Amino acid sequence: MTNRNIFYATTLVDELARAGLRFVCLAPGSRNTPLVLACARHPAIKVFSHLDERSAAFFALGLALATDTPAAVVCTSGSAAANFFPAIVEAHQAGVPLLALTADRPHELRDSGANQTIDQVKMFGGFVRWSVDLALPEATPPPVVVRSLRTLAARAMAIAGGEPPGVVHLNLPFRPPLEPTPVAGDITAPPDAAQPRQAGAPYTYCLTATRSGVPEAVIEQIASLLQQHERGLIVCGPRCPSGEFGALVSELADRTGYPALVDGVSGIRFGYPGVIGGYETFLFGEHSFPPPDVVVRFGAVPTSKWLNQYLDTAAPSAVIHVRAGGVWADDSHRVSHFIAADESAFIRALLPHLKERRGAWIQMFEEAEAQVWSAVEAALNDEPYFDGAAVYDAVSLLPEGAALFVGNSLPVRHLDQFGKPGARRIHAFANRGASGIDGNISTALGVGAGRPDTPMAAIVGDITFYHDMNGLLAVRRCGVPITIVLLNNDGGGIFHRLPINRFEPEFTDYFVTPHGLHFAHAAKMYGLDYVQVRDREAFRRAFRESIEARAATIIELRTDARADLARRPALMRSAKASDVRGL
């Protein structure tokens, strides 16, 4: 591999082959040279050369029809790609698995009048199941970029051949040189991240469960993998299933001896025995926790920065992600097995194959968990009262079955760090799809309207509150008795965690954007009760009274963002399990 283009194309095509691609139809051109060479030189791929792109695409369609597996067609940039369209329409309508790989000009030539350059991004519209416009190859790509090429290829094959089968379009821009000419400074040998996990095997296995569930052979393979490794983790991110899932995760943790690290808005942080919630603190900064060998994931990408960093640095040999609907959530591109299946059904099928195991590994996490909450509780009465303590107290005061919505930015992170797991079942919600601060109050009120028989609370920051203040009109119009905890640190407090905080005056003027607002008048305008608090005793009293009375109340806690910022890492350092044993 002599330059970045050859490296990218070779890595992508190699993973397509590992995922099952056997037939590729090639049409001549210049811009697709790296792809042509990668396909022609791969020993597992049979290539068919065609003079015309339209014929090549239909020939690939025939291959896919005959084999019932995805076939690929490759072309250069410009109108060559448009000639794929008739075959793509047919493949879409007939449900035939097909990969369209179109080479493209670099981004700076798009919309510039450059020769043989058209808009190829999503050019096949709704006739494809998935369309990706790849980034330009880099001279020395970081490992995550190389891993992303392999997971992209695995996903492309899985989606094209999934249920229903159809077309996947990958658009690949290249700058010259397109031929295998050596370029000084370009990557010449694959880094470790580019290597497959074992000879001939895919980097990521993608499996979609059938109506009868996950095949027994796959369940047995996963069970065998878990039994081989004592050091494992169960990680539950946001938006895990409801129903029996939480109890099944607890049972899976007991059976495997793996700690279950559950996100504050996973749906199972509160009310399920044995789950771990203090990881944002005990994994903070430098720590002595050994890396896990295997990770079983459910839900979306975790909220916790330090948990994500720990998992990425650990580079487990196996990361098994189970998620109904097949929605991908792996921004570090570490997943080795992606199983699109009902999570509860998967665990139920897996449990009979596992022998109960409990060792020093899980005890280490349980000891760290106990130490974290002991340190947090010891610091709660320290002055001044801070936002994380208010979140801890709100969770501790909510009754069984209550609903809690947390706003984005800091509150959702505070819940993840300071929401102590407990016996009471609390239903926690957040807008973690795009993680915006817009519409959070309205979403919280919608949650309350959907659960009219249980107490409802929301915790939001001041900028989030300001963004959706008009949503408060629904409190009276729709009859939603909600307790809103307003954490007012006079601006975008989360920006204090970013390196830009060292650069004044721009940091204060354009990132924090202090507003100097108090929100008593907003409460009065929309007909809500209002309480401003400054200490722990006042907050706990106001929150308890509002929840018990099912009153529509705004409880405003004014804090200092810089003081809160200093308080959190100091608490984390004091709570860290510094004496964790090496295993």
From Swiss-Prot:
Q: Is-annotated flag, keyword Hydrolase?
A: no
According to its UniProt record, in which pathway does this protein act?
Answer: Quinol/quinone metabolism; 1,4-dihydroxy-2-naphthoate biosynthesis; 1,4-dihydroxy-2-naphthoate from chorismate: step 2/7; Quinol/quinone metabolism; menaquinone biosynthesis
GO MF annotations in UniProt? 2-succinyl-5-enolpyruvyl-6-hydroxy-3-cyclohexene-1-carboxylic-acid synthase activity; magnesium ion binding; manganese ion binding; thiamine pyrophosphate binding
Q: What is its EC number?
A: 2.2.1.9
- Work out whether the entry's keyword set contains Transmembrane helix: no
Q: How is the cofactor bound?
A: Binds 1 thiamine pyrophosphate per subunit.
Q: Which residues form the signal peptide?
A: none
Which UniProt keywords are given for this protein, alphabetically ordered? Answer: Magnesium, Manganese, Menaquinone biosynthesis, Metal-binding, Thiamine pyrophosphate, Transferase
What does it do?
Answer: Catalyzes the thiamine diphosphate-dependent decarboxylation of 2-oxoglutarate and the subsequent addition of the resulting succinic semialdehyde-thiamine pyrophosphate anion to isochorismate to yield 2-succinyl-5-enolpyruvyl-6-hydroxy-3-cyclohexene-1-carboxylate (SEPHCHC).
Q: What is this protein called?
A: 2-succinyl-5-enolpyruvyl-6-hydroxy-3-cyclohexene-1-carboxylate synthase
Which lineage?
A: Bacteria, Bacillati, Chloroflexota, Chloroflexia, Chloroflexales
Gene that produces this protein: menD
